[in-house]
């Protein structure tokens, strides 16, 4: 498959790895237990922003991409978005720690792992090193309403919160 585009259905049986946020496991040094997150099922009746990036704790991802979504979360919620999720090839432990390092609580933004970039590879949006590329997908009740892949690893425009908000 060569990416997703507006009008496509979100693929069936998409499963990510995820550690849910809990108060007792809220410290960055605490460790939760990964679970399967059945995205296709969970998002079937919701409005969702899924944005992906090459890796947790990396320069563009940590300095600009994630912080912009955190900052603009109230605006995103006001537009009727039920779920905001960030995706990378890192394992669920790293993604959980990255969410905590960014001060995200109560699953305000889901920090999901795409093990071996399986989903990203399935849509043709993984790089030659096996990492998720930088992209954004907006879903509304299982239908893609916006999908964009950045042209380069350090490019941040089409998957930015600012651009995605314009497409809600």
From Swiss-Prot:
Record's protein name: Putative peroxiredoxin prxA
Matching PANTHER family: PEROXIREDOXIN, PEROXIREDOXIN PRXA-RELATED
Organism, scientific name: Emericella nidulans (strain FGSC A4 / ATCC 38163 / CBS 112.46 / NRRL 194 / M139)
GO molecular function annotations of the record: thioredoxin peroxidase activity
EC number(s) reported in the record: 1.11.1.24
Binding partners and assembly: Homodimer; disulfide-linked, upon oxidation. Interacts with thioredoxin trxA.
Entry similarity comment: Belongs to the peroxiredoxin family. Prx5 subfamily.
GO biological process: cell redox homeostasis; cellular response to osmotic stress; cellular response to oxidative stress; hydrogen peroxide catabolic process
Gene Ontology cellular component list: cytoplasm; extracellular region; mitochondrion; peroxisome
Top-level enzyme category: oxidoreductase
Induction annotation: Down-regulated when grown with elevated levels of potassium chloride. Induced under oxidative stress conditions dependent on transcription factor napA.
Superkingdom per UniProt: Eukaryota
Catalytic activity entry: a hydroperoxide + [thioredoxin]-dithiol = an alcohol + [thioredoxin]-disulfide + H2O
Signal peptide: none
Active-site feature positions: 61 (cysteine sulfenic acid (-soh) intermediate)
Further comment found in the protein's record: The active site is a conserved redox-active cysteine residue, the peroxidatic cysteine (C(P)), which makes the nucleophilic attack on the peroxide substrate. The peroxide oxidizes the C(P)-SH to cysteine sulfenic acid (C(P)-SOH), which then reacts with another cysteine residue, the resolving cysteine (C(R)), to form a disulfide bridge. The disulfide is subsequently reduced by an appropriate electron donor to complete the catalytic cycle. In this typical 2-Cys Prx, C(R) is provided by the other dimeric subunit to form an intersubunit disulfide.
Cited function: Thiol-specific peroxidase that catalyzes the reduction of hydrogen peroxide and organic hydroperoxides to water and alcohols, respectively. Plays a role in cell protection against oxidative stress by detoxifying peroxides and as sensor of hydrogen peroxide-mediated signaling events. Involved in osmoadaptation.
Domain Thioredoxin: 4-158
CDD domains assigned to the protein according to its UniProt record, in alphabetical order: PRX5_like
Gene from which the chain derives: prxA
Sorted UniProt keywords: Antioxidant, Disulfide bond, Oxidoreductase, Peroxidase, Redox-active center, Stress response
């Amino acid at each position: 498959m060569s990416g997703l585009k507006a009008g496509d259905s979100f693929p069936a049986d998409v499963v990510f790895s995820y550690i849910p946020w809990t108060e007792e496991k809220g410290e960055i040094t605490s460790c939760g237990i990964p679970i399967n997150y059945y995205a296709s099922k969970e998002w079937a009746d919701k409005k969702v922003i899924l944005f992906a990036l090459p890796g947790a704790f990396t320069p563009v991802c940590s300095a600009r991409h994630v912080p912009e979504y955190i900052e603009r979360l109230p605006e995103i919620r006001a537009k009727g978005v039920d779920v905001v999720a960030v995706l990378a090839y890192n394992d669920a432990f790293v993604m959980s720690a990255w969410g905590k390092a960014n001060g995200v609580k109560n699953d305000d933004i889901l920090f999901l792992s795409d093990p071996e970039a399986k989903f990203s590879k399935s849509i043709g949006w993984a790089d030659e090193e096996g990492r998720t590329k930088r992209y954004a997908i907006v879903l509304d009740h299982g239908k893609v309403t916006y999908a964009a892949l950045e042209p380069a690893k350090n490019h941040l425009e089409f998957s930015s919160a600012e651009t995605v908000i314009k497409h809600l």
